[in-house]
Amino acid sequence: MRISFEEMAIKVADVVKDRSEDPYKKVGVCVLNKEGRILSVGYNGLLSKQQISNDFWEDRDERRKYIIHAETNALACITRYDEPYILASTLLPCANCAINICSHGIKHVYYTEEYHKDQLAYEIFDFYKVSLKKLNI
């Protein structure tokens, strides 16, 4: 049976998350246009070529200050002219990422896991009329 574009995007995001160096929480994102073509992928991590010591990852609160979210990394690679339509994430986006997602004109967000239920993220998606759906894949 042929899988849907949403399922494909989630599976791509699940593979992409393995690029993250974060040993505690790996997140992957895949952005599609209306035709189901992949526009961008992203994962949570530091800026490219950032040199860090191995003990950087041990202090959760310290590392969280510097990590760039997967959604931000994926959206940084596209423009509104690309007409992003669907964002699939392995984790429910936080409120800050929700605003960023909405500002890019994305209409549908799919995710597979809730790390922390972020009520504000739900409210933001609802306010901007972006559909949000948890997929069980």
Locate the predicted segments by residue.
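Zinc-dependent deaminase catalytic domain
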Residues: 1-137
